[in-house]
Regions:
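N-terminal amphipathic/basic leader segments beginning at the initiator methionine
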Residues: 1-27
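Mg2+-dependent prenyl diphosphate-binding active-site environment of isoprenoid biosynthetic enzymes
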Residues: 7, 20, 32-277, 283-296
Length: 300
């Protein structure tokens, strides 16, 4: 198997190229103009590095079923556009109020707040441009399932709803169950969708789709838990964003509730859960197992 780090980097380049092409100055059918400042802000927010982990999960779950990888990349690019829009909005003064993202000024710092809001809005629509493009050759029912799943994972009952719960938690502290729900929505929903999408693309069985959904839920919680540990134990240079923000904002996290050592123990448990869920897929799931390990051992 090709070195995991190289695989992840290769995928990041490919997804970056797809997003770069979509965010060119070329006016597409149905558009009137592409304002240069808005386009520059979108490019700043989406082409500023990143691991592209969510697209990687779409592609690698699709490989389990020998699905069309070009289609999986397209779905992955759509998902990454939504993820990047969420980061732009998350960094705004009204929310996390952060100056750095991936070691560079956040979009509202590089441009202004209004432009950052609109850049995020436009990236959200780009996602559905990817999925509805007739160049993406998909069965209509599969396409609709992908669009519907992404909309629900990103919206009221998923990522956006989780962000609201996160803001509310600054003043009204949730218990452990409430924090897990918050994190499953804010962070986990898009990761779970990434793992489901590969199965949807392949028209996999309900059992396989549900198994991958559970895998996505486990690594989604692990991702957020690892993030919360890093916020406490790492520094701004290593993270590429301001360290210690959760403590300063008095945010409700499992690390704040139980401590770092408890969190590290939980991460190992989630890793085992993720591995167990992949057993039926045999050696074809080795890269997904490596991805789960990467999530809990990453440094940023």
């Amino acid at each position: 198997m090709e070195d995991f780090t190289n695989l992840l980097a290769k995928n990041a380049r490919q997804i970056g190229e797809m997003l770069d092409a979509k965010l060119s100055s070329h006016i597409e059918a149905g558009e009137i103009a592409r304002p240069s400042r808005l386009l520059a802000a979108m490019r700043h927010g989406v082409l500023n590095g990143g691991k592209r982990l969510r697209p990687f999960l779409v592609i690698e779950t699709a490989r389990l079923f020998d699905a069309n990888i070009e289609a999986a990349q397209c779905v992955g690019a759509a998902l990454e556009a939504i993820h990047c829009y969420s980061l732009i909005h998350d960094d705004l003064p009204a929310m996390d109020n952060d100056d750095l993202r991936r070691g560079k000024p956040t979009v509202h710092k590089a441009f202004d707040e209004a432009t950052a809001i609109l850049a995020g809005d436009a990236l959200l629509t780009i996602a559905f441009d990817f999925l509805s493009d007739d160049k993406l050759e998909l069965d209509a029912k599969i396409r609709l399932k992908l669009i519907n799943g992404l909309a629900r994972s990103a919206g009221l009952g998923g990522m956006v709803g989780g962000q609201v719960l996160d803001l509310e938690a600054e003043t009204k502290k949730p218990d452990e169950s409430g924090i897990i729900t918050l994190e499953a929505m804010k962070t986990g929903a898009l990761i779970r969708y990434a793992c489901e999408a590969g199965a949807i693309l392949s028209n996999a069985t309900r059992e396989d789709r549900e198994r991958l959904s559970e895998f996505g839920a486990a690594i989604g919680l692990a991702f957020q838990l690892a993030d919360d540990v890093l916020d406490v134990t790492s520094d701004t240079k290593a993270l590429g964003k301001t360290a210690g923000k959760d403590i300063a904002a008095n945010k409700a996290t499992l690390v704040a509730l139980h401590g770092v050592e408890w969190a590290k123990h939980q991460l190992e448990g989630l890793m085992k859960q993720a591995d167990d869920l992949l057993v039926p897929f045999g050696n074809k799931a080795d890269i997904l197992k490596a991805t789960a390990r990467f999530i809990i051992e990453r440094k940023n």
